Structures are given as structure tokens and as C-alpha cells.
């Protein structure tokens, strides 16, 4: 789609560097049953989560990282809503969904992705997080969830300034699914009309199941 894959990879290495300022506040660094957000209000939790963007930009500036890397840090969440804590605020305080004041408190500062590379990073970050919650062998659910993550961000206007077309978003989705299925050791999932005769939604068999049995009288690991 005309994007720079090396730049995408470099941005991916640094996009969450701001989380190192307060690592225990982010779920990927928390031990089971130990979540400091349990004792905080939704608005304070959202402010802490949102701050990893500002903290990352400050680190990038201090260490003189190139501007494209800084762009990846700034734009990788766009202006997306911090959904979990937004939902808690609605539940606890009875706010009306879509309230402008609440929206400002529970959205990332942006800007929205301005390039193909930051748009890919934005989507990959969301898809990777969602894929962690889906068990191996749930290929149909994986395809549905990846598609929904991309569509939710498109519908929210997060990709409006990146110039990506619907066709390119479809190609990005297919690429994500191939990568995720490779990591999870599953076959690539194809939608109806896209499948080929070798595709399957079932996990690959173990290698030893695909090998012929050893000849009689021969040790399976050699002579």
C-alpha cells in the first residue's frame, strides 16, 4: 500500500515507551489480582493511561529521537476513547453517553494518524491487544474481532487524515490475520469468497503427526 515497513517497525519499538514512567499502571505489567486502578476513580485512571503518550513524547525529545518516531508515539492512539474507564464513569456516575465534557476527559489527545505508517501502527496496536484475549483455535472469532477493531476506528474518524482507502484497509486486515495466525500456529482465515482449497480455520497439526512413522527396527531418533 506504499507504506515504509522499516519505519513502521521502528515506530512500533518506541510507541509505548512512555509506559516505562509508571509501568505498574498498565495491565501488561500487572500481576494477577493486583490492579492499582481498583482504588482510583475512572477519570484519574484515564488520565494516567493517557499520560503515557505525553511521557513518551517527552522521553523522545530528551533523547533526540527522529520526528517520525515521535509522530508514532503521538498518533498511535489518535483521539480514541479510553473505553474501559469511560464505561466505568458512565456506570458509576450516570453520565449520558456522548457528553462533550466526558468525551474530553476520556479520549487521547491525538492527533489522529497523519500518515499510512502511523495509521498502520494505530491499527496494529489495537488488533494485537484484542488478539491476546482470543484463545487458540478461535479463528472465526479472531477474524471477526480484527475486522471490528478496524471498522470501529474507521467509523470514529481515526483514519480520516491518513489517506488510506477501504481497499487498503482490507489488505491491512488480511496482513494482520496472516501474521496473527502464524504467531498462533493456525491457518489463515479467509472470508467467504476469498478461500482457497488449502485454507482452514483449524489449527495446524503437530509436526510429528505429519511425518510418516519410523521404519520397523529403526530407532526414531536415528541409529
Enumerate the predicted regions with their spans.
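Generic low-complexity, intrinsically disordered sequence content enriched
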Residues: 146, 184, 211-215
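Divalent metal-dependent catalytic cores for phosphoryl transfer on phosphate-bearing substrates
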Residues: 1-156, 165
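Generic N-terminal initiation segments characterized by hydrophobic and/or small/turn-forming residues
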Residues: 147, 166, 177, 204-208
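Cytosolic regulatory/linker segments at or just downstream of nucleotide-handling modules
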Residues: 153-181
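Long, low-complexity, intrinsically disordered segments
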Residues: 203-223
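C-terminal amphipathic alpha-helical interaction region
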Residues: 190-197
Amino acid at each position: 500500500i506504499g507504506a515504509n515497513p522499516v519505519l513502521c517497525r521502528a515506530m512500533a519499538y518506541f510507541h509505548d515507551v512512555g509506559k516505562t514512567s509508571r509501568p505498574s499502571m498498565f495491565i501488561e505489567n500487572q500481576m494477577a489480582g493486583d490492579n492499582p486502578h481498583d482504588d482510583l476513580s475512572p477519570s484519574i485512571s484515564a488520565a494516567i493511561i493517557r499520560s503515557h503518550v505525553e511521557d513518551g513524547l517527552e522521553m523522545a525529545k530528551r533523547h533526540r529521537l527522529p520526528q517520525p518516531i515521535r509522530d508514532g508515539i503521538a498518533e498511535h492512539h489518535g483521539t480514541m476513547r479510553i473505553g474501559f474507564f469511560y464505561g466505568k464513569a458512565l456506570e458509576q456516575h450516570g453520565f449520558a453517553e456522548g457528553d462533550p465534557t466526558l468525551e474530553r476527559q476520556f479520549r487521547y489527545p491525538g492527533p489522529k494518524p497523519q500518515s499510512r505508517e502511523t495509521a498502520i501502527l494505530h491499527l496494529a496496536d489495537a488488533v494485537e491487544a484484542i488478539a491476546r484475549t482470543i484463545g487458540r483455535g478461535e479463528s472465526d472469532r479472531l477474524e471477526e474481532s480484527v475486522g471490528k477493531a478496524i471498522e470501529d476506528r474507521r467509523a470514529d474518524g481515526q483514519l480520516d487524515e491518513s489517506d488510506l482507502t477501504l481497499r487498503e484497509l482490507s489488505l491491512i486486515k488480511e496482513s494482520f490475520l496472516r501474521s496473527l495466525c502464524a504467531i498462533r500456529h493456525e491457518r489463515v482465515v479467509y472470508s467467504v469468497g476469498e478461500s482457497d482449497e488449502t485454507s482452514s480455520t483449524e489449527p495446524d497439526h503437530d509436526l510429528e503427526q505429519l511425518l510418516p512413522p519410523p521404519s520397523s527396527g529403526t530407532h526414531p531418533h536415528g541409529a
